Amino acid sequence: MSATNARTTPLRRLATAAVAVLAALGMAACSGGAGSSSSSGAQVGDRSPEQIKEAGEIVIGIFSDKAPFGYIDADGKPAGYDVVYGDRIAADLGVTAKYVPVDAAARTEVLASNKVDITLANFTVTPERAEKVDFANPYFKVSLGVVSPTSAEITDVSQLAGKTLIVTKGTTAEAYFEANHPEVKLQKYDQYSDAYQALEDGRGDAFSTDNTEVIAWAIQHPGFSVGIKSLGETSYIAAAVKKGNTALLDWLNNELVELGKENFFHKDYEQTLAPVYGDAATPDDLVVEGGVDTTSTN
């Protein structure tokens, strides 16, 4: 199915803005190089909260093309649900936030190579990832969803047999379908923006990623529907730090407890996600306060 060229949506405009500033953000990400040191003498990634305070800046990895969670807004500034959280982390440390764009597949690497202190790029906790990074307690929960053209809507995984499913590299969707549905042909992209464009251009039959994302995208793209709204088990989104940085990990977990007392993530949802989802979702379905999912039956 071909995209309608004349269609311009808020997410499309944001994607255009992201392209315009991505190079500048990338330069900022690389300016220090791997293992860069702060004014405190400690390497980014290895720093404790006190060393971050001394440096006056915390470096946070985010998505630049994944609205409404992490993206570049029309003014060329980082925005979204994860960015509001990142801004609060920086404020409570008494420092400024420096945001670095990351691809989904590079979220662990930027921590291991000392490019960021924290990854806040809508990072789903998995056992495999937990071997490479240390996850804080969760602040969001998701499952997988599948979006497809309404004219050829995919409503059950069985319909994907022999068809082409678009996924983004390094995501839980890629891992899930590789492990559970080898009958589905996967077409992989590095960037979310490229994956969505491939769907619009008709290069694949459907696209799968977190249900929160495909629901938001479909709302703003007439002609596409989320026929599968929940696939696989409930997964959790959390901040991640370099493996072994227990000082920063403990600070983040304590911060989550304090933020939970004020329902911070409900407020973040109302600011960044509610305008997109409307009645399609509620904060109680998605947010996790205090680092503990009180609705879980597991």
Please report, for each region that a protein language model flagged, where it lies by residue:
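C-terminal motif of bacterial Sec signal peptides marking the signal peptidase cleavage site
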Residues: 25-29
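Extended ligand-binding regions for polar small-molecule ligands
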Residues: 31, 83-84, 88-92, 171, ...
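Ligand-binding clefts/hinges and TM-proximal coupling segments of bilobed small-molecule sensing domains
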Residues: 32-38, 175-189, 226, 256-298
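Extracytoplasmic small-molecule ligand-binding "clamshell" domains
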Residues: 38-122
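Short helix-initiation/N-cap motifs at beta->coil->alpha
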Residues: 45-46, 99-109, 152, 169-172, ...
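Acidic, polar ligand-binding/catalytic clefts
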Residues: 87, 96-159
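A ligand-binding cleft/hinge motif common to bilobed small-molecule-binding domains
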Residues: 109, 123-131, 200, 204-234
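Periplasmic-binding protein-like
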Residues: 140-148, 215-256, 276-298
